């Protein structure tokens, strides 16, 4: 990964005479002596390749020429005995490509000296907060502390500068996403081989998560969804405690994370190895929408336009089944979007002003139908790479037709 190039691109987007301060974050306390698994700020990882707590990146465009400094946590031998080694200065230099690496204890003084001695016009922090989050974000907190300490300095948001770069993947990023998809494929095939009536949803989940870890994934990309029967109609069901019954379907929405990048795949399998005629009829409508979106995706399109195309196909199929009378009623059975960007985040970052797809974008293709009265929930999700004149289905090798799935589950 060319982290240096990314930092240079962000510096180019920053205002003249500004600096950016980006923190990796801190561990979140859960209870007693328990901490949540640490997740580094995604933009920090994107610009450094590092995913450890208590680090900071400073991009200094007020200097001439511009400077880049990385601050890392100093090792404590006693704490390392309990929790493992910290990243060394040499390791941080090698991973990030940054030559000026200092310890975090020097950061406050370095910032203060910069603000006192030089004419800094603006300071960037990553002040983005997801609308669904009510937890304090560490970078937002640090931005507030800075604003209180230096009230005359303009605080700006770094997030859109990094997000505008993250929307388009380079060849190295595409290769890692392909690797994550390959691991996901292997694990899904293991799930299919073991799937049978009477097993618990969490056993299908366990088969998947065991196999991705065995094949080099760091973690699941997100909490695995393994919903059988009526549970397949619940979009983000992840309790995964019910019994898989013969004659029912199981919807598996899952993915592997490899080197910080994610796959996001959904397949819907017959628990007993065979789809019923009704299930197959609904499945083929969803499959037709999936294939149509993959065919239509290209530079210049938007995810909203792809969703309109998806809804047209789904509505036509539902009317043929007699479930709806007019196409506008498709939202009774399909209530989400067909595509989102994919990368370091599963629902990867976007910038509203850059809604049109360009070569290098990786998006999902995930039509679905959720029919409560039939206890049928079907979603088929693939990952697409937007190319110069169309889209490449990165997950094409993960089988999806009813005939392929039935044959595989029968051992053929």
In which residue ranges do the predicted regions lie?
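Active-site neighborhoods and metal-handling regions in enzymes and metal-associated proteins
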Residues: 1-412
